């Protein structure tokens, strides 16, 4: 039976394959792409470079680099991408998740001009975490965020950033796991986390909660420290950040002291 921690982080290849239905050939390619993504030794990726990279998307819903890798029948490419939610340029706390989910009536909400503008402005990197803003109260993302974070967070939306390994919405997280290692935009995000966020967390400058898929983020061998929490086992199934959770406790400690 796969190790509980590995099942959570994605570290057990057999478990990941059973969930995503990869063929043997796809499994080999998946592993190769994942290793390549984590061994990229090019220049450090900064938050400003992340914003610049995503600014090139213009009015499109899919980054040009990603188009060869995404299937429209697996991802909701009619929705705005969410590589991050919150001020990636200045956040005091970063939370790592897999990819944004999807419910059928989400499309109608995102056609509303005000919400569409908020979603597009999010890519500027200086906007508050939007899913808990009043404009999103009727959006399905609001319900998810409220259940995930619980109370006592709304006053800190300008200091929290949720990073998604895969920026595109899907109903099945298994599809995101399949493409994460090969998707160019995901490689950028992985590099940003490893180069910038992790280093700053170790220096005590930001908090880091690895809530989902630590192996796919290339962080499964990172040790927990004062400002770094890695969810394991049952923690990462729903990845709560409520006051009673380990991540939620760290988040509130950091936000309260700054």
What are these regions (language model features)?
Residues 1-132, 196, 220-228, 258:
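Active-site and ligand/interface coordination hotspots across diverse enzymes
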Residues 2-34, 38, 42, 158, ...:
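Glycine/proline-rich loop-helix segments at beta-alpha junctions forming the active-site rim
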Residues 69-84, 140-149, 183-198:
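A Trp-anchored, charged/polar loop motif used as the substrate-binding/catalytic surface
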Residues 113-173:
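Low-complexity, serine/threonine/proline-enriched polar segments
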